[in-house]
Amino acid sequence: ANRRAYDYVVAGMRSSVIKGTCKSANRSDYLVCGKTGTAQNRGQDHSVFMGFAPMNSPKIAIAVYVENGGFGADYGVPIGALMMEQYIKGKLSPSSEKRAEEFQKRHIAYGSRNR
């Protein structure tokens, strides 16, 4: 594959984190690259996020797929961001710990619209 094409993809994924649908994954201590997706379904859409970090020296690449989770930014991005933080930092910050607890309490109504 062409290095220039790779650089364009990385720049696009970084842009999505800075000013697009992946904003909630943005961090000041390491650069995250990612892309959301919404897989349409007869019921609630599926939430998808793929990303990697740090941008210039990746240590983790992740794909998150939440069945009936809605838009990619609804569940995929926040869950993926928490997983990357845990892997890279070895633990979650207190605010991320709180966010993880909130996500564990959420209920997804499979097969129905719940937005």
PLM features: residue spans?
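Active-site beta-strand/loop architecture of penicillin-binding DD-peptidases
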Residues: R3-P94
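Short, gly/Ser/Thr-rich active-site loops of penicillin-recognizing serine hydrolases
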Residues: I79-R115
